[in-house]
Regions:
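Non-transmembrane, aqueous-exposed alpha-helical and coiled segments at domain scale
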Residues: 1-137, 143-204, 209-290
């Protein structure tokens, strides 16, 4: 299989099949909800949808999202932006992606999902969190040193719910400390309600500037949900789920499937808390490329 074909296959699988850790979290959430409740029905429907999409190889959500590729820098000459764009255009032609890219000024549709700035491509070091996820069907240790490409698809509904706070925040009574960070995160969850297709996942960055904050927060969405959480992540997940917002905002025990937090250095004058929200359709996948 050549590189273009391998990337097309990556796009197809990412669009049609959830990672095992996300499926596991959804199934665990379904078991917690009261039988016959709105939350239980929503989660059952989500899981049925996932099974059908995986079996047919068709997109599991109509919004196939913004495509963001993280490419091991060792592959810079092999997996070029031109190669990636060719794969995206071919995947769109095959129906693995919908026509989902619009010129923000003219309103023109880029029917192959390819133009300047789309798809998004980042070349990163092999130790980047984006390349640390387990490759399907392989062990982490086996693939640790092999160059990889990771793809994440993020739909507009979840992207619209992402937000950034600047501390101190007088309206929240939030200062420049972890208590203030906690206030921002819980405020974001409360405001999101079910609009971002809950249950969701939060990627959080404490610090950084406005640009690196969003970048780091989004990268946290690539971390496995079954990875051992920090004490802060565990606490915030528990507190967010205690709000009772539930799947699709209809009430229930599971508002979030996970919280993943990173910290970045900041200048004295700024203290940002950035939250990248991902819906239940956390479509991410990694493939080795030799």
């Amino acid at each position: 299989m050549n590189v273009v074909d391998k990337l097309v296959d990556l796009i197809r699988k990412t669009s049609s099949s959830l990672p095992e850790d996300v499926l596991k979290a959804l199934k665990a959430a379904a078991r917690k909800e009261r039988k016959g409740s709105s939350a239980a029905v929503v989660l059952k429907t989500i899981l049925e949808n996932c099974a059908i999409a995986a079996k047919r190889g068709t997109p599991l959500c109509q919004d196939t999202g913004t495509l963001t590729f993280f490419v091991d820098e060792r592959l810079r000459r092999k997996v070029t932006p031109a190669v990636i764009k060719k794969a995206v255009a071919l995947a769109t032609e095959k129906g693995y992606l919908r026509k989902n890219t619009i010129d923000s000024v003219t309103g023109k549709s880029y029917d192959d999902n390819v133009c300047e700035g789309a798809p998004v491509v980042h070349y990163v070091g092999s130790d980047n969190v984006a390349l640390g996820s387990v490759v399907s069907g392989s062990s982490r240790s086996k693939d640790a040193l092999r160059p990889k490409v990771t793809l994440i698809l993020k739909g507009g509904g979840s992207e619209n719910m992402s937000r950034q706070y600047s501390l101190p925040d007088a309206a929240l009574g939030a200062g420049r400390d972890l208590a203030g960070v906690r206030a921002c995160i819980l405020d974001a969850v409360q405001k999101i309600q079910g609009y971002g297709c809950a249950p969701g996942i939060l990627g959080v960055c404490i610090g950084g500037d406005r640009a690196t904050g969003y970048e780091a927060a989004k990268e946290q969405l690539l971390r496995p949900l079954d990875e051992k959480p920090s004490a802060l992540e565990k606490r915030l997940l528990r507190e967010a789920n205690s709000l009772g917002i539930g799947p699709m905002g209809l009430g229930g025990k599971t508002t979030l499937l996970g919280v993943k937090i990173a910290a970045r250095p900041r200048v004295p004058a700024s203290f940002f808390v950035t939250i990248a929200y991902m819906c239940w359709a956390c479509r991410r996948r990694t493939v080795c490329v030799e």
